[in-house]
Amino acid sequence: MARKKDGVYKIVEVVGVSEKSWEEAGRAAVETAAGTLRDLRVAEVTQMDMKVDNGKVSAFRTRVSLSFKYEP
């Protein structure tokens, strides 16, 4: 059985925003980041909050910690 090489991974935080849900905001964060970051491995939701305007929820925000293989 072939053994996987050890690796180094970098972690970045991104925030996705949606008018509909936290899930959609998280998905937007990951999919947008995937456009510029290669080899994404893990996405961890670290915080969820809402933007409030005039007493009403105007947006759902999801903070996501993403890890990807570091290639110097």
Region spans (language model):
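N-terminal, polar/charged subdomain of small-to-medium soluble alpha/beta proteins
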Residues: 2-72
